[in-house]
Amino acid sequence: MASSASLQRFLPPYPHAAASRCRPPGVRARPVQSSTVSAPSSSTPAADEAVSAERLEPRVEQREGRYWVLKEKYRTGLNPQEKVKLGKEPMSLFMEGGIKELAKMPMEEIEADKLSKEDIDVRLKWLGLFHRRKHQYGRFMMRLKLPNGVTTSEQTRYLASVIEAYGKEGCADVTTRQNWQIRGVTLPDVPAILDGLNAVGLTSLQSGMDNVRNPVGNPLAGIDPDEIVDTRSYTNLLSSYITSNFQGNPTITNLPRKWNVCVIGSHDLYEHPHINDLAYMPAVKGGKFGFNLLVGGFISPKRWEEALPLDAWVPGDDIIPVCKAVLEAYRDLGTRGNRQKTRMMWLIDELGMEAFRSEVEKRMPNGVLERAAPEDLIDKKWQRRDYLGVHPQKQEGMSYVGLHVPVGRVQAADMFELARLADEYGSGELRLTVEQNIVIPNVKNEKVEALLSEPLLQKFSPQPSLLLKGLVACTGNQFCGQAIIETKQRALLVTSQVEKLVSVPRAVRMHWTGCPNSCGQVQVADIGFMGCLTKDSAGKIVEAADIFVGGRVGSDSHLAGAYKKSVPCDELAPIVADILVERFGAVRREREEDEE
């Protein structure tokens, strides 16, 4: 375990770097053929009934001039997480410097005190720190905020230096929200790491528990010849609002549950709007550019729903006021009992969409929320493009190169090399994607061949196999205490086994998640695997997976349905091969050989 005596290695290497926090260029909407907004194929709420004034009374109130807490009369039937929040304000660990004192405490002393034990297991998630009590006791995963998935070589080197210090315990993952998670962190080092993050323009604040997750945007923003709008300015505005410019924003840190937001910038819908609590869909109204809004999309163990139209449009300049209004309506009115029924869609179901919309509208600065534009700018016939490999940018003489990162896992040496490649061949920038891959933008065409010959691209290939290129996997039980099965190595193994059985004519997206929380987003995959346990033919308990089939992304988005339950992992490959033959046009290898 890293010693607190070694804190110096995490201190800011470049004190001036915080000045680089200002974000990329402005918005550019380009005219494209409009298409009508289509509601996702989710069941719509029942017809609105009158909602009582009592039900619309806010359940939280502001205390001490900053923190929002649950009112006394609503404190019955709470879930355990809400009780932890009431026991001590989680944001005080950051906003009042509590983390510095906690970091000095020995683990034995922490364990002996109920509040401090809750601090390391629950409240530190408000600072993006997740104690790996079950699998890496005393070590933490740290999740960052990386709006639009855009990061710099300087930031990447800093993160690499952090995980390098932890040896075999340290590594990093690209997440399904265009983000970094770093592993192996020890508590005594946290204050220095937070300072180091701040110096390079990063934060981990408000990235876990009942907070707004990383704002997602088009990974090709600003370089895509066919983009509708550059999403970077919007996602950076959202991130700045969410964390109040890294200072902490306690008005939205006591939500009933986590909350996801994305801004759509292309016809490809790389951002997966249908599974976000709030999705901004580009649309023009009265000749003015703005966004139609979708709300309520989510994935959870018991239920998954596609986002629904709010029947609302906002000008591009008003993305923050409406985000604030939606969040405050959810914060004020959401229920806090059964944890499986606290996502925002449950509130929409209870109130009805029109009543929910009314609550959002009255929280707008001028009390007005315009009705949706009749058409958005998404081309519903658009074929989703592959960003892996070499592709021309809108900037003449430039290309971007998409690299496949197998199941998103990256080591310190890989990160140092990625930073070097970004500097040597590009503009010092990297883009992370929701499929756990990395894009190097702004590569001069004359440098492309040299980049493709770099040794790292043997590991992070720009041209992976058709089954590997769409492979996504959550952390799994190697590090996550909630995961039922190992996922990352299992995903690679099963894919390798399947590739020996069949040949596919196109990419097939396969997602793995270690438990029903579905961090691996199996419901958006062509074929998904959700971890569980079952008995094999000998009656032995073994790792298994529920299989999902039929998820779609892009202009024809749709969530997958259950196909087969509790299949032992060792028996998955032939079943997956059958699915690929029956539904995806795959050809069995023995047939290929016969034809040759």
Swiss-Prot record:
Pfam families: NIR_SIR (PF01077), NIR_SIR_ferr (PF03460). It is an enzyme of class 1 (oxidoreductase). Residues 1-56 are annotated as: Disordered. GO terms for molecular function: 4 iron, 4 sulfur cluster binding; ferredoxin-nitrite reductase activity; heme binding; metal ion binding. It catalyses: 6 oxidized [2Fe-2S]-[ferredoxin] + NH4(+) + 2 H2O = nitrite + 6 reduced [2Fe-2S]-[ferredoxin] + 8 H(+). PROSITE patterns: NIR_SIR. One of its GO terms (cellular component) is chloroplast. Disulfide bonds: none annotated. Its main location: plastid. Pathway: Nitrogen metabolism; nitrate reduction (assimilation). Binds 1 siroheme per subunit. Binds 1 [4Fe-4S] cluster per subunit. It comes from the Eukaryota. Residues 31-47 have a biased composition (Low complexity). Its cofactor is siroheme; [4Fe-4S] cluster. Belongs to the nitrite and sulfite reductase 4Fe-4S domain family. Monomer. Catalyzes the six-electron reduction of nitrite to ammonium. This is Ferredoxin--nitrite reductase, chloroplastic.
